């Protein structure tokens, strides 16, 4: 019967089961050796069909209701599951048998070398074992024995192979099936798995800008961008139904394929105008979006309003005047102006500037709430762009209900009642005569009515009330009767009752109590004095008290902190220094509570030492609690100890006079103004970073005409909108610090490494405070000083800062707080922790890498600001911050405090950044031609030379600094 084993399959002569085919041999699995003869017979009620793995070695015989599948030379490729079905059976019954061809040389039979599925479907890799004994040691690996990706969920079936459940796009790899045979791993051939993205619809499109206007000859750019989860899609840009040939740029971002078409027009002309459409399509369909490009001959500026330019409003009501502006180029300036006639004051409107349809149309709103009589008149909106000035004027007239008065007089010898009524619109007048004495004739019997359809107009000027006069001639006054003058217009009505008493008569307006002038005067004075007393009491309660911001933690449980009472800290007499050994100089800064004075200390540290120091002291009018607060600050500083990046305590005078706290003298002033001076030196006063679109700049304290107070102890220059100086600027030669002096303050241009240097040193100082369980509570660039060698030192200068006039400190309750630097939990829950200091440090980083901009530029501190903070709003990346530095800021601004990094982690990261910067030198400063010593000096030589000059600078403030050119600033 030939080599191998002959398996005789008996023909079933009877039908077994209802509607289910029968396979002989009737076993679920069959194991044979290579070269064996295998015969499989299937019998059913009708015709039957076989289904199984494809193989060239099978022979098929059909005989009515039976079908025979046979081979005389079985190979590993015959391994698989064979299923017999009866096509005509409505119940769909079937029978199956699994065949193993046990080939030691070929342990795996791979039925397909490529498998394609959609994402989140199960992917079956059909590698079948030829020997069931090997099932215990099977596994799935990537090619070359690499392990599977994490979170890969798979299972194995000896009849079907490996199944990767809910396959992901990232799992598109080449895989191999592995089995243990004789203690060694044997691999199948590779199977490529392709996991395709599920395409939800046509590609997403963006066309920028949504509308475009250009003057003939200007440059223009139109960007058409399409993205999809699958790379197989087309995109094109067409102009007025003409497809444009534009090079395509491709990218893969956020798990989406992106294709971008950019049309650049160097000089636009009228033929470039028209409709532009961005069209993209894939297997799911087509998507398109359009924009209109308008080319004009010259600049234009159009003003219009949907409102009537002549407005009438009842006094006390509100009005919003709206002007729609259509302009190109954009506005260079705009304002609302009051043109009279009542007063020369200008309105202080609440302006709402909202972009309506597109970039070139705006709506400006002048809000006039609760209109007063003096606010009637003409309001003009003026706007300017390169196309010229335009104005739109509204005329506002106020409507008033009539005011009425009546007097008795004689005209041409006849007794006459004279009624004067004023209001707008012009009032009509009616006379009534009624019986009895009453305030209104509605309450009595009306005897007679006279209408005056044409009262005499006494005055009628634009925007004023109209005053009319009506005369009623009365021959004889009936003393038991009332004469009433009524006036009415569209707004309301008014009346005055005239009641004859005797031979004369007196009048009184209805519902009005009569007081003697003496009683009224006394009551007015008493009310005024009471209000004045309440105001003084309120001001006293609102006045901020000097307190030390720094807090030292004694213990904590969760977010509940117990702080050490600084008054209970010991004071070591070793810090005591003789008052007579201090020679005071100029005042460095003065605030609401005290001042800081430059001084020379003789014998501090060493007997013959002469050292320049800064001395903190209170004002002579200080209260006892403020004296206690300064003493607490002294105790905290002595408790913390010394650190290079803290403004260190050098000594104190606590006996025989007011308390004096002696600290290090920092010659370069505070970090905030240092950065702002650098920004001005580099970019100029009108080109500093963050220029306001209306023509102003964010550095409102930087002007060429202004003088600067030298910030030796951390006090800023005078006249800053957002940062208030603690004393007026002196113009004397001793106290002023001119801009020429500032230009000479530092001989080396600013580089990225300097900003990293400042950031790292502040982080080290904060890490030191954190290690001492100290919370700063006011981490900001204004509270960081720079001393010799540009060493950054952290301090607290609340003593000498006028927080009443510093807009950085916002009133919350009875306190003034730097809310733009505060963490959400500090603002809303009054919780201060080391983690809240980390948030503030992130704001300080933003200040450093924006070169001294005010945080949250353009955002006022109001309810919207608090909502932004609560919702997790984060400022944009500063212009001079590398991406990884901005990542630190974002980590510091995590809403959950426990998710913020520690200061130690920040230190480590910044030190690594500094080392990387030294290696790569991506950001460099060009050597200044004005610098002595030649232009060929290396940066390290310049740095050493600059460092050697720091001490001279600190003592004399007199070294030359090259101008910072924009191209020296390589890290923006």
UniProtKB/Swiss-Prot annotation:
Signal sequence bounds: 1-19
Glycosylation sites: 45, 73, 153, 240, 275, 302, 335, 353, 412, 428, 480
Tissue expr: Expressed in bone marrow and in differentiated blood mononuclear cells.
Keyword Nucleotide-binding: yes
Active site: 778 (proton acceptor)
SUPFAM superfamilies (alphabetical): Immunoglobulin, Protein kinase-like (PK-like)
Disulfide bonds: 42-84, 127-177, 224-278, 419-485
SMART domains the UniProt entry points to: IG, IGc2, TyrKc
Ranges for domain Protein kinase: 582-910
Cytoplasmic compartment residues: 539-972
Annotated positions binding ATP: 588-596, 616
PTM annotation (Phosphotyrosine): residues: 546, 561, 699, 708, 723, 809, 923, 969
EC number: 2.7.10.1
Family that this chain belongs to: Belongs to the protein kinase superfamily. Tyr protein kinase family. CSF-1/PDGF receptor subfamily.
Name of the featured protein: Macrophage colony-stimulating factor 1 receptor
Organism: Homo sapiens (Human)
């Amino acid at each position: 019967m030939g080599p191998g084993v002959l398996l005789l399959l008996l023909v079933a002569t009877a039908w077994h089961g209802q509607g289910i085919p029968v396979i002989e041999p009737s076993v679920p699995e069959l194991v044979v050796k290579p070269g064996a003869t295998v015969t499989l017979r299937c019998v059913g009620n009708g015709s039957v069909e076989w289904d199984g793995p494809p193989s060239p070695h099978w022979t098929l015989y059909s005989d009515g209701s039976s079908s025979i599948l046979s081979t005389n030379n079985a190979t590993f490729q015959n391994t698989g599951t064979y299923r017999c079905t009866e096509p005509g059976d409505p119940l769909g019954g079937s029978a199956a048998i699994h065949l193993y061809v046990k080939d030691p040389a070929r342990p795996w039979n791979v039925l397909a070398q490529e498998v394609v599925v959609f994402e989140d479907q199960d992917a079956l890799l059909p590698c079948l074992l030829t020997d069931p004994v090997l099932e215990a040691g099977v596994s799935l690996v990537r090619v070359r024995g690499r392990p599977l990706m994490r979170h890969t969920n798979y299972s194995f079936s000896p009849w079907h192979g490996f199944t990767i459940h809910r396959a992901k796009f990232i799992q598109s790899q080449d895989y191999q099936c592995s089995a243990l045979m004789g203690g060694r791993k044997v691999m199948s051939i590779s199977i490529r798995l392709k996991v395709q993205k599920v395409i939800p619809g046509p590609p997403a499109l963006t066309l920028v800008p949504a509308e475009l206007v250009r003057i003939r000859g200007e440059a223009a750019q139109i960007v058409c961008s399409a993205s999809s989860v699958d790379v197989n899609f087309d995109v094109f840009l067409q102009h007025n139904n003409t497809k444009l040939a534009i090079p395509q740029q491709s990218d893969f971002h956020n798990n989406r394929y992106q294709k971008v078409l950019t049309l650049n027009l160097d000089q636009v002309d009228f033929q470039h105008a028209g409709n532009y459409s961005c069209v993209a399509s894939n297997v799911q369909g087509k998507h398109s979006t359009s924009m209109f490009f308008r080319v004009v001959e010259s600049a234009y500026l159009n003003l219009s309003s949907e409102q009537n330019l002549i407005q009438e409003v009842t006094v006390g009501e509100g009005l919003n005047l709206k002007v729609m502006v259509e302009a190109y180029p954009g506005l260079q300036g705009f304002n609302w102006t009051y043109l009279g006639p009542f007063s020369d004051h200008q309105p202080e409107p609440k302006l709402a500037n909202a972009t309506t349809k597109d970039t070139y149309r705006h709506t400006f709103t002048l809000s006039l709430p609760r209109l007063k009589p003096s606010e009637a008149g003409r309001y003009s909106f003026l706007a300017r762009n390169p196309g010229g000035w335009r104005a739109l004027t509204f005329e506002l007239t106020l409507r008033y209900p009539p005011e009425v008065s009546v007097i008795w007089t004689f005209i041409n010898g006849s007794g006459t009642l004279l009624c004067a009524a004023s209001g707008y619109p012009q009032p009509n007048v009616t006379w009534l005569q009624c019986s009895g004495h009453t305030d209104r004739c509605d309450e009595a019997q009306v005897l007679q009515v006279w209408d005056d359809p044409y009262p005499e107009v006494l005055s009628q000027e634009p925007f004023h009330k109209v005053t009319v006069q009506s005369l009623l001639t009365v021959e004889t006054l009936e003393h038991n009767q009332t004469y009433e003058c009524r006036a009415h217009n569209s707004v309301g009505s008014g009346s005055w009752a005239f009641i004859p008493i005797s031979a004369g008569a007196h009048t009184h307006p209805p519902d009005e109590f009569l007081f003697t002038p003496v009683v009224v005067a006394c009551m007015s004075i008493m009310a005024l004095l009471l209000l004045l007393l309440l105001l003084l009491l309120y001001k006293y309660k609102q006045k901020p008290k000097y307190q030390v911001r720094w807090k030292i933690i004694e213990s904590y449980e969760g977010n509940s902190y117990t702080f050490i009472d600084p008054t209970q800290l010991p004071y070591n007499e070793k810090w005591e220094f003789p008052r007579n050994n201090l020679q005071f100089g100029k005042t460095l800064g003065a605030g609401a509570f005290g001042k800081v004075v430059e001084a020379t200390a003789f014998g501090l540290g060493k007997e013959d030492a002469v050292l320049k120091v800064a001395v903190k002291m209170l004002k002579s009018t200080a209260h006892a609690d403020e004296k206690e607060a300064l003493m607490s600050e002294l105790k905290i500083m002595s408790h913390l100890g010394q650190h290079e990046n803290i403004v260190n305590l050098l000594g104190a005078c606590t006996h025989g006079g007011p308390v004096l706290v002696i600290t290090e003298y920092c010659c370069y002033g505070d970090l905030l103004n240092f950065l702002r001076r650098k920004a001005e030196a580099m970019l100029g006063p009108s080109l500093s970073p963050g220029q306001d679109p209306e023509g102003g700049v964010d550095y409102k304290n930087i002007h060429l005409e202004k003088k600067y107070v030298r910030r030796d102890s951390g006090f800023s220059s005078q006249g800053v909108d957002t940062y208030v100086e603690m004393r007026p600027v002196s113009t004397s030669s001793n106290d002023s610090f001119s801009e020429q002096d500032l230009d000479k303050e530092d001989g080396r241009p600013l580089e990225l490494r300097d900003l990293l240097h400042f950031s790292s040193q502040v982080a080290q100082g904060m890490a030191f405070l954190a290690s001492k369980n100290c919370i700063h509570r006011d981490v900001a660039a204004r509270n960081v000083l720079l001393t010799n060698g540009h060493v950054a030192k952290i301090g607290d200068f609340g003593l000498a800062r006028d927080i009443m006039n510093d807009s950085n400190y916002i009133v919350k309750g009875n306190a003034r707080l730097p809310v733009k630097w505060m963490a959400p939990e500090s603002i809303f829950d009054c919780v201060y922790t080391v983690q809240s200091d980390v948030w503030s440090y992130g704001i300080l980083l933003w200040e450093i890498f924006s070169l001294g901009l005010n945080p949250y530029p353009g955002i006022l501190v109001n309810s919207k600001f608090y909502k932004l903070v609560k919702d997790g709003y984060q400022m944009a990346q500063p212009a001079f911050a590398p991406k990884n530095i901005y990542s630190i800021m974002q980590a510091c601004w995590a809403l959950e405090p426990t998710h913020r990094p520690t200061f130690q982690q920040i230190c480590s990261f910044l030190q690594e950044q500094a080392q990387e910067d030294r290696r790569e030198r991506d950001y460099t400063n060009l050597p200044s031609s004005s610098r002595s010593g030649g232009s060929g000096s290396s940066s390290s030589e310049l740095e050493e030379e600059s460092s050697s000059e720091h001490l001279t600078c600190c003592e004399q403030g007199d070294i030359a600094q090259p101008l910072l050119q924009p191209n020296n600033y390589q890290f923006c």
